Regions:
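N-terminal localization/anchoring segments of enzymes in phospholipid and broader phosphate metabolism
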Residues: 1-314, 318, 322, 346, ...
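Helical hairpin unit composed of two closely spaced alpha helices linked by a short loop
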Residues: 323, 333-355, 359-360, 364
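Active-site-proximal loop->helix
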Residues: 368-369
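Active-site donor-binding acidic/aromatic loop of nucleotide-activated sugar
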Residues: 385-389
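Catalytic-core elements of nucleic-acid end-processing and repair enzymes
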Residues: 396
Length: 476
């Protein structure tokens, strides 16, 4: 017969052997001391269970396969991008331009033309037309890519591009590609289109990073035209039979040197996923003319839980510090942490007009409850918050003083700022910013302003529910 005491001692030793180094990892590597404390307490209470949870959800870093396989620069998309300070950037934004350049290691590019595409009604036809026009290559990355409705049209367009000889690569985040029954991943495979899923959740070596997702939306045609923004390929954003019921979003078409930053981002993600390094020939011949396409100075910002950690946070906080007159934030999820709350409040207290526009009808109730639990912390310092009624609004945009804007995939929540791979573009262009301010103002004017008094007047049960949801903001 086995000795119960011996088994107990063995189990205790195993628990300690696992729990002690796990707790040590949390103490050394977790950046937030409150987070480290909570993990250590959980591991102390549940040595094996807490250690397992920490291994799955507590290690928020991702080892880049692309960096390991190909540490050198790819001449197709990686040129000398040491940050420089163009004279075209006005003095109030020189510090911000320097900050983002230091954070990203990329220079501002001139001569870009950036065009906003409002909702699926404008974005999807423009993207489909670009795919149909592709001569050399199509590179598409999407967080969600449905196979039905508008997604079926994209699958067909990609299949036709592949069949006429263009090189096509499609990258979809694994969670949505593998676990959604309507994902386009299998439809693309059946059509013979080269497709892959980012960070597969079924690979044991990557289980610790299963919650780190690729939220980027990129489309590059022939290395000349790019699209990025907040738009997934998803039927709720395409309702030609009832356009008033379609969800809202903002996407952008880009031409000019900044498209190389989209190419670089896709190249790294594709190589990281498949091991295939896209060569210079993949993108086709460079444009025959070097004439400038437009007047925007722009720079791509890759951010994620790898070497690019915190780039988006630094950009947002730097922009808030640079603001002199106005800050407009358009986001589907407004769940800022304490440093971001302090930066927003500081800007408002300096006399800057700070406005936040977010949907009244969210697609994730828990996130919306947590967001409303944060409202009072910025409202009391002069930040104004507006909730847009009607269909869900997935738009993502930041505007400063009518001169600078930041567009792309990132939200104002912990998942975008720390856990997801995101891609944004910062743009210095008064004309574009003015146009985008008009879009923001129109949506804001159709929205309801939230007051601190109204928040306090809500039933206690609702406030408790929201407060409990707020406890989970680090992972929402």
């Amino acid at each position: 017969m086995s000795d119960p005491n011996g088994l107990t001692w063995a189990a205790t030793l195993v628990s300690l052997a696992v729990a002690i180094p796990t707790a040590g990892h949390a103490v050394i590597y977790k950046r937030d001391p409150r987070s480290a404390t909570l993990w250590v307490l959980l591991i102390a209470l549940l040595p094996l269970g807490g250690s397992l949870l920490y291994g799955l959800f507590g290690i928020n870093r991702y080892q880049r396969r692309a960096r390991r396989l190909f540490p050198g620069a790819d001449p197709a998309v990686r040129q000398d991008l040491a940050p420089t300070m163009p004279q075209a950037v006005s003095a109030p934004f020189a510090g911000l331009a320097h900050l983002v350049g230091r954070a990203t290691g990329q220079s501002l590019t001139s001569g870009n033309r950036i065009e906003p595409l409002v909702d699926g009604e404008q974005a999807y036809p423009a993207m489909l037309a670009a795919i149909e026009s592709a001569r050399h290559s199509v590179a598409l990355a999407s967080y969600i890519f449905d196979s039905q409705g508008i997604g079926a049209q994209f699958v067909d367009a990609l299949r036709r591009a592949h069949e006429r000889g263009a090189q096509v690569r499609v990258l979809i985040d694994d969670v949505y590609a593998r676990w959604r029954p309507r994902s386009a991943y299998r439809a693309l495979q059946r059509a013979g289109v080269p497709a892959a899923t980012f960070n597969p959740t079924l690979i044991p070596a990557r289980l610790h990073a299963a919650h780190l997702r690729n939220h980027r939306k990129l489309l590059v045609i022939d290395g000349e035209t790019g699209f990025t923004g907040g738009m997934n390929i998803f039927s709720p954003y395409w309702r030609p039979d009832a356009p008033e019921q379609a969800c809202h979003d903002l996407h952008f078409r880009l031409r000019g040197p900044v498209v190389a930053h989209l190419m670089r981002c896709f190249t790294d993600d594709w190589c990281d996923t498949t091991g295939e390094r896209l060569s210079k020939g993949f993108w086709g011949e460079p444009p025959a003319t070097a004439d400038e396409q437009g007047t925007s100075w722009a720079r791509g910002i890759e951010a994620g839980p790898d070497e690019a950690l915190d780039r988006m946070r630094w950009t947002f906080m730097g922009a808030l510090s640079a603001a002199k007159h106005s800050v407009r934030i358009w986001t589907p999820y407004f769940v800022p942490d304490q440093p971001m709350i302090a930066a927003l409040s500081t800007a408002a207290l300096r006399g800057v007009r700070v406005e936040v526009l977010t949907p009244a009808n969210g697609d994730h109730p828990t996130v919306q409850w947590a967001a409303r639990a944060h409202y009072w912390q910025v409202l009391e310092h002069g930040v104004r918050i507006f909730e847009r009624p009607g269909p869900f609004d997935h738009s993502k945009l930041m505007l400063i003083d009518g001169q600078w804007c930041c567009l792309g995939s990132a939200n104002w929540d912990a998942r975008s700022l720390r856990l997801n791979f995101e891609f944004n573009v910062e743009v210095y262009d008064t004309a574009l910013s003015t146009r985008l301010e008009s879009l923001f103002d129109a949506a804001r004017d159709a929205s309801d302003e939230i007051s601190a008094m109204a928040l306090r007047a809500r039933p206690l049960a609702i406030r408790l529910r929201d407060g409990v949801a707020r406890l989970f903001t680090p992972i929402l």
